[in-house]
Amino acid sequence: MNIPTAWLQLAHKRTRLIVALSGIIFSTVIIFMQLGIRDALFESAVHLHNSLEGDAFLISPRSTSLIAMESFSERRLLQVLSFNEVELVSPIYVGYVQWKNPDTKNYWRNIFVIGIDLRYQAFKAVGIKENWQKLKIKYTTLFDQNSRREFGNITEDFQKGKTIITEVGNSGNNQKIEVVGLFELGTSFGSDGNLLMSYPNFLRIFQNRSSRFIDIGLIKFQPDIDRQSLLKKLKKYLPKDVKILSKQEFINFEKNYWATSTAIGFIFNLGVFLGLVVGIVVVYQILYTNVAEHLAEYVTLKAMGYHNRYLLWLVFQQALIIAVLGYIPGFLLGMIQYYFTQKYTLLPIEMTPTRAIFVFGLTLLMSLIAGATAINKLQYADPADIF
């Protein structure tokens, strides 16, 4: 009986109900968008980390993220081979280079370059295995087909069988390079596109770099060993001029940079908070006005013997109804926003069950907070004051 009563009170003023639902929908969409882009930022930042088939990684202690790696001596990586539990090690070189759009005259754009050792297939991504041998040719590269279109119609032209030769430049030194295949990695906030090549080709482009100084050292362990024990041994064995991380620690290292060392994480969290505030304020105004208009009826029920709990529950039911009815269209609009954001930015943004449940919980919370604030007038209302 209570639920219909709560609904009838809300539906009696349809315009007011629509305003309340609009506030919840707006807040829900804002929260979905802020959380979606924030999580896409973190996930896109670790595309490379997830694609590397290693159990541990060496980096310089001065490195802060993938976009700001500091080189260290390859000798440290080779020292790891003194442990029998280590199956192989592989150097990885990374850097940015200017890419010339072959379709647009004199249009250059920064692109992220990954140089790998072709002796070991330690990189898992679509398109790499079938093009592995092609990378042994001088001045060849694989192009990330998920790169932004500002780099040119590379994917479409290559799939049509066209030969793609363009220029890349580093420190004023331009080199012609041929795209011999496509692979899939994905863009991030730090990279609009990616190239994958052999490390000899990498060094031909980055002529100021030496093969003796690497950016990431990939370490693969022998199967069926105690990985944590070996990691502890390696940390004790290696000098302090390198840092050794497990794969999960390597992923967390990158995510922590974007979450704590940049303003991006704070900005998106602030957006979530502001979305909550907007929802609370709108729902509070609606519920407070509703309570004020029906105050005489409420105190009459009090005089008839109804407890405060009954009346408070009536208001909370209205808050819950507003939350549920507002969340459903907010969820659907969030799905639509995710679709277009992924389509036009190529960020890995998608609706997840965890996020959907979390935002629903936030929606209920904001409505209940608004309801709890709005019932103060009702809680202390005295029939003698009204009549």
What spans do the regions from the language model cover?
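Basic-flanked hydrophobic alpha-helices used for secretion and membrane insertion
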Residues: 123-124, 145-245
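Membrane-interface junction motifs in transport/secretion proteins
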Residues: 26, 37-74
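Hydrophobic alpha-helical transmembrane segments of multi-pass inner-membrane transport and secretion
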Residues: 14-41, 261-299, 320-327
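A short amphipathic helical element positioned immediately N-terminal to and/or at the very start
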Residues: 2-11
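C-terminal membrane-exit region of the final transmembrane helix in multipass inner-membrane proteins
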Residues: 2, 349, 354-387
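Transmembrane alpha-helical interface segments in multi-pass membrane proteins
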Residues: 275, 288, 292, 296-342, ...
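Peri-transmembrane interface segments
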Residues: 230-281, 289-293, 309, 313-314
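The feature marks short, hydrophobic/small-residue-biased sequence motifs that occur predominantly
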Residues: 74-78, 82-83, 87, 91-142, ...
